[in-house]
């Protein structure tokens, strides 16, 4: 039904998303319902099939998040990217989902900015996705004005709602900083 509505707007890019997982393997409490995520995967697979048939985009949050959970649970059986209800993502889980979504859109490897300065030659040799001006080089100082065309994502280190993890904790399980948040400066 909803597919027919979507088809009325061919100029709009459609992306279907497979749900985050129900974490039935973490041991942070005793309220796991084995088999629940298997049922969720049936819905994920249905959405993936619909996306393929209609030539729409698809992002699977479930399988990559399950893989991360299981990898981390090998060392810490209480680890989870999900909250206390085992289905809704925790703060670090949300960053993992954002990373997976952005990566699926082809944004991995896009620079925030990259600057290279030749100090001896007193010149900017690279300024990707930014503008560098007013370069001044002396024997003990180098200054310049930097105008970014984009900004890095500010990783949150705060705890919310008594969660065990922060958004920053996700950086240990996904290469977000390298793939999505690189802002480089090199002086030679």
Predicted regions mapped to residue ranges:
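Generic hydrophobic/packing signal
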Residues: 9-12, 56, 86, 91
């Amino acid at each position: 039904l909803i597919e027919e509505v979507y088809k009325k707007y061919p100029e709009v890019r459609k992306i279907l998303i497979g749900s985050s997982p129900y974490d039935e393997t973490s041991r942070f409490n005793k309220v796991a319902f084995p088999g629940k995520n298997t049922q969720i995967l049936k819905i994920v697979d249905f959405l993936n099939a619909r996306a393929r048939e209609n030539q729409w985009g698809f992002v699977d949050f479930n399988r990559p998040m399950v893989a991360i959970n299981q990898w981390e649970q090998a060392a810490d059986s209480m680890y989870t990217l999900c909250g206390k209800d085992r289905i809704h993502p925790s703060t670090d889980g949300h960053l993992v989902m954002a990373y997976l979504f952005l990566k699926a859109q082809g944004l991995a490897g896009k620079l925030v900015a990259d600057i290279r300065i030749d100090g001896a030659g007193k010149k900017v040799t690279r300024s990707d996705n930014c503008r560098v001006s007013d370069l001044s080089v002396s024997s003990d100082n180098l200054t310049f004005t930097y105008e970014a065309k984009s900004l890095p994502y500010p990783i949150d280190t705060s705890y919310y709602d008594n969660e065990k993890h922060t958004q920053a904790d996700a950086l240990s399980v996904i290469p977000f900083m390298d793939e999505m948040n690189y802002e480089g400066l090199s002086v030679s």
